From Swiss-Prot:
Cited InterPro entries: EF-G-like_DII (IPR053905), IF2_II (IPR044145), IF2_N (IPR006847), P-loop_NTPase (IPR027417), Small_GTP-bd (IPR005225), T_Tr_GTP-bd_dom (IPR000795), TF_IF2_bacterial-like (IPR000178), TIF_IF2 (IPR015760)
tr-type G domain boundaries: 426-598
Name used for this protein in its record: Translation initiation factor IF-2
Binding of GTP, residues: 435-442, 485-489, 539-542
Positions of region (G2): 460-464
NCBIfam families xref list: IF-2 (TIGR00487), small_GTP (TIGR00231)
Keywords: Cytoplasm, GTP-binding, Initiation factor, Nucleotide-binding, Protein biosynthesis
Ranges of compositional bias, category Low complexity: 61-78, 121-135
Organism whose genome encodes this protein: Mycolicibacterium gilvum (strain PYR-GCK) (Mycobacterium gilvum (strain PYR-GCK))
């Protein structure tokens, strides 16, 4: 059948139901939707082949029977020559087969009358039909032009016997090429049996064309191989040709020759069987051998594939069987291996690690109630949960480990001295002054270095870290000591923690008249967490009410036991203002350093340290205060600190003087960064600017991802409804004089406790004055600009006034926190509480066509007020609420309100009222938020 055929047409042709055809197509790997769908010609051919052996036609069963025998002989394809003789023994089941060889001779002589024999052959077919069933019907259906394609007789084939070959419709005519080959090679020897001559009769085989399909029934001739001498048997074996011709084009032809001869001479059924045996070379249509009709589009013939799956499909199916189902989506299944992910990683990063599709992970989380995108940063808990569902152990790499791996990728290391013991030299101790606000930390440092830094601090509160190196004369020896001053206000927790990590010894300043305060305890915790020795300075001993003994007792509770109490912590009573016992304090610091610390470093390596503070200077650009911990920093070095990099163009000490190099434990201001580094960032020297830039860029990307994962509020499906409601949001842009202050301010603001109705969002932060860029961003996002110790630059103020952008300036951090907290609370939706006005009982009801039911009431308590909110009670049960007193009259006059004890008439926005009902009126009063 040329062209496409519909499933129901094929079903009708094959005598089966459409469902069976659809099922068979499914087994063959073809996707067909319904009985009205069309299938390609090659698919239809394979379908007919698969149903051929099952057809009820008598002819086909015969073919099947004959096929059964050939199957075995086909294996010894090399023996086609001798075949003529053995057919009889080989086919014990079919006695007629032996006779076939004898009759082979006459067969060749009758090539011309092939047309006539078909009829008798058909009649002969029925007898053999019963035997066919026992044989394998499946191979039978495989037609193949190969067998009958003997060499010389090729031309004859052109006159095909349409009706002879029941399977001819499945044999493409293009088999001619192989036919010639058959005779060419093995064909020569095979003709020996004498069948070679008549073999040309095989020509009819080729005649088989797609259009011959209908003639299948006529295929009966197979059994009647006798009637058709030469070609008769051949066509009968037509279905078998698969093996003979295609399986071994050359030899196959010869084999078929012999078989043909043998079959031809024999009786109808026997001949067919014999013929098959004679040309089993084709393998009796075995799939292994490419015998039988050629497939469409040049595909080899052979048994139908029956929808066999490819190895790849089987492998995929097996893997899918092992895959867990999370949220209705199939995902890879791990073996408990550990997956390392950076903090703030996205689902795409996770998918790359486990070789999965990011869309599947997104769908899985969506079905589990989490709405995230493939590129959105995901928090650690979500990644661990998703990994656990797939049998993976997700390990979120800490920032320290991630940074270490980053440096290792550039063959760099941080935190260790290079060289041996001989390369280490003494370095000065680094001392951090810590304590509660206003306890005298900066005054103590001023007294030590004879400076007046305290007067420059707003409100007398230290706003950022200062690092200084002073030289102390102890017992005739000059000992340099580096001091780091930290702020004591509660908002500067992170800055105190950095100071503790960068120090060797901590001086804890406690006011003798104030005692241990919250920030005092916090400073103790920071120092103990960093394993830093503590020297306690009890300050303000000259003030009234000072009680140093009380301080010692309080600090004992926190593990700081004085030496006089049998502990190992040195306590020194001082007065920073009067300069009392300052020398004793410094001596205690040096003794502690010498006794418990190994203060050595290698000055010959490339410099490493920590950025204590950083700010943006109008004339000098980004300026970072760095503390060198090991190595020597020189002008011209390529440096990287956090996500900032650059080349050292200038270094300045605490006195404002330029220095060419800085040794370990020396604090200096470095100028030359391309951006402002963060306070507390690691600082190190690299070989090239290129390496510094690459490290900084990768740190910056990692920082953005981590920040996004921390600040982005995830919305679950359960919260979606409430999230879509209108919420108030206060956007802020923070600008400060240094990075540490900006960081502390941001942490304090984000920590303000307000209702979920209001959100605080810091959309930008930076160091330096307020610029026009900041104003434009604030205008576009309805943000407020907070300037801390900075002012607007150039035309920024004019632009802000024109755009209506609010800029607020602060110099004291807690003032900024208080005002912003008040602003947030002002954005909250007001809270209303109900205040009862009065109660009235309905004594009579008057009906009006204009206004509805009118209630005649007696005011029992309070007042009835027009347009007031009301509710209707019946037997002390609320019948209706959120009502309004539409009109109110006292006798015949309109009234605004009616007091207790008076009668009135009123109408409500509700008509189902009865006598005896009670009307309560009330008003909503806004309640101040606390």
């Amino acid at each position: 059948m040329a062209g496409k055929a519909r499933v129901h047409e094929l079903a009708k042709e094959l005598g089966v139901t459409s469902k069976e055809v659809l099922a068979r197509l499914g087994e063959q790997g073809e996707f067909v939707k319904s009985a009205s769908s069309t299938v390609e010609a090659p698919v239809a051919r394979r379908l007919r082949e698969s149903f051929g052996g099952n057809k009820p036609d008598a002819v086909k069963p015969a073919a099947g029977a004959s096929n059964g025998a050939p199957a075995k002989p086909s294996a010894p394809g090399a023996r086609p020559g001798p075949r003529p003789g053995p057919p009889a023994p080989a086919q014990p089941k079919e006695p007629p087969a032996p006779a076939a060889p004898a009759a082979a001779a006459p067969a060749p002589a009758a090539p011309a009358p092939p047309a006539a024999p078909p009829a008798p052959a058909a009649s002969a077919a029925p007898p053999s039909a019963p035997e066919a069933p026992s044989a394998r019907p499946t191979p039978g259906p495989r037609p193949g032009p190969g067998g009958p394609k003997p060499g010389a007789p090729k031309p004859a084939p052109r006159t095909p016997r349409v009706g002879n070959n029941p399977f001819s419709s499945q044999q493409p005519v293009e088999r001619p090429a192989p036919r010639p080959q058959g005779p060419a090679g093995p064909g020569g020897p095979r003709p020996g049996p004498g069948a070679g001559g008549p073999r040309p009769g095989g020509g009819p085989r080729p005649g088989a064309t797609p259009g011959n399909m209908p003639p299948r029934p006529v295929g009966g001739p197979r059994p009647g191989g006798g009637p058709r001498p030469g070609g008769g048997p051949r066509p009968g074996a037509g279905p078998r040709p698969t093996p003979g011709g295609a399986g071994r084009p050359g030899g196959g032809g010869g084999g078929n020759y012999r078989g043909g001869g043998a079959g031809g001479g024999g009786g109808a059924g026997g001949a067919a069987a014999g013929g098959f045996r004679g040309r089993p070379g084709g393998g009796g249509g075995r799939p292994g051998q490419r015998g039988g009709a050629a497939g469409a589009f040049g595909r080899p013939g052979g048994a139908p594939k029956r929808g066999r799956k490819s190895k790849r499909a089987k492998r995929a199916e097996y893997e899918n069987m092992q895959a867990p189902v999370v949220g209705g989506v199939r995902l890879p299944h791990g073996n408990g291996e550990t997956i390392r992910l950076a903090r703030g990683a996205s689902l795409s990063d996770f998918a790359d690690k486990i070789n999965a599709n990011p869309a599947s992970l997104v769908q899985a989380l969506f079905n589990l109630g989490e709405m995230v995108t493939a590129t959105q940063s995901v928090n650690d808990e979500t990644l661990e949960l998703l990994g656990g569902e797939m049998n993976y152990v997700v390990q979120v790499v800490s920032p320290e480990d991630e940074d270490r791996e980053l440096l290792q990728s550039f063959d760099l290391s941080y935190g260790e001295d290079e060289g041996g013991e001989d390369d280490l030299e003494f370095r000065p101790p680094v001392v951090t002054v810590m304590g509660h606000v206003d306890h005298g930390k900066t005054r103590l440092l001023d007294t030590i270095r004879d400076a007046t830094v305290r007067e420059g601090e707003a409100g007398g509160i230290t706003q950022h870290i200062g690092a200084y190196q002073v030289t102390v004369d102890l017992d005739g020896n000059e000992r340099p000591i580096t001091f780091i001053d930290t702020p004591g206000h509660e908002a500067f927790t992170a800055m105190r923690a950095r100071g503790a990590k960068a120090t060797d010894i901590a001086i804890l300043v406690v006011a003798a008249d104030d005692g241990v305060m919250p920030q005092t305890v916090e400073a103790v915790n920071h120092a103990q967490a960093a394993d830093v020795p503590i020297v306690v300075a009890v300050n303000k001993i000259d003030k009234e009410g000072a009680d140093p003994a009380k301080i010692r007792g309080q600090l004992t509770e926190y593990g700081l036991v004085p030496e006089e109490y049998g502990g190992d912590t040195m306590f020194v009573d001082i007065s920073a203002k009067a300069g009392t016992n300052i020398e004793a304090l410094l001596e205690a610091v040096v003794l502690t350093a010498d006794a418990s610390l190994d203060l050595r470093a290698n000055p010959d390596m490339e410099a490493q340290g920590v950025a204590i503070e950083a700010h943006l200077d109008r004339g000098r650009g980004p300026v970072a205060t760095v503390l060198i911990q090991r190595g020597t920093l020189r002008v011209g070095d390529s440096v990287v600190a956090g996500d900032a990099y650059g080349r050292v163009r200038r270094m300045v000490d605490e006195h404002g003087e330029d220095v060419e190099e800085a040794l370990p434990s020396r604090p200096v201001q470095v100028i030359g960064f391309t951006s402002v580094p963060g306070a507390g960032d690691n600082f190190l020297v690299v070989d090239e600017d290129r390496i510094a830039r690459q490290i900084a860029d990768r740190r910056s990307a990692r920082k953005r991802n981590a920040l996004a994962a921390r600040t982005r509020k995830r919305i679950s499906l359960e919260d979606l409804d409430s999230a879509l409601k209108e919420t108030s949001q206060l956007n802020l842009i923070l600008k400060g004089d240094n990075s540490g202050t900006v960081e502390a301010l941001e942490e304090a603001l984000l920590g303000i406790q307000v209702d979920d109705e209001v959100q605080l969002r810091v959309i930008d932060r930076g160091v330096g004055g307020v610029t026009e860029t900041n104003v434009n961003l604030a205008s576009a996002s309805d943000a407020i600009i907070i300037g801390f110790n900075v002012r607007a630059e150039g035309k920024a103020t004019e632009l802000a006034n024109r755009e209506g952008v609010e800029i607020r300036y602060y110099s004291i951090i807690y003032q900024a926190i208080d005002e912003i907290e008040s602003a947030l609370k002002g954005m909250l939706k007001p809270i209303y509480e109900e205040k009862e006005l009065g109660r009235a009982e309905i004594r009579a009801i008057f009906r009006s066509s204009k206004v509805g039911n009118i209630a005649g009431c007696l005011v029992q308590s309070g007042i009835m007020r027009r347009n007031a909110k009301a509710r209707l009670l019946r037997d002390n049960v609320v019948v209706a609420q959120n009502l309004t007193v539409s009109s109110l009259k006292r006798e015949k006059d309109d009234a605004t309100e009616v007091r207790e004890g008076y009668e009135c008439g009123l109408t409500l926005t509700y008509n189902d009222i009865k006598e005896g009902d009670v009307i309560e009126t009330y008003e909503l009063v806004e309640k101040a938020r606390t």
